[in-house]
Amino acid sequence: MNAKAYFAQARSLPMQIQAKTKQLQAVRALQEPLAALPEASKTLSDLAADITAEVQAYAALQRQLQTLIDSLPVPEYRTLLELRYLSGSKWEEIAEAMSMHVRWVYRMHGRALQAAQKILDAAK
């Protein structure tokens, strides 16, 4: 997996967890009318287990990404990737926090991903 796809997981997993949580809330709202059906209880517990597993996977991914980010040689790369992928900041917020123009943040992001890719390749 390349560095860009690896980091992209950090932005997509929370959305998946949020979608499943909404689904769980919808099922819980229907739970009382469906209480007589044994399948409803099983569906609810299966959904809760799925959410728990995804939250655990997300936490593990966050730890892996933090380790990778910490190994980058340039402090600005570390800051940028932490803001983008661990804090979920938007490009404009990152540019403001780092006192840079957004276009420069995009360029630096590409360079940071290249540096991260070198570390990932060396670890193989």
Question: Where does each model-flagged region fall?
Answer:
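Short, well-structured alpha-helical interface segments that form or flank functional binding sites
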Residues: 5, 89, 107
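Short amphipathic alpha helix immediately N-terminal
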Residues: 72-89
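Helix-turn-helix DNA-binding module
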Residues: 87-103
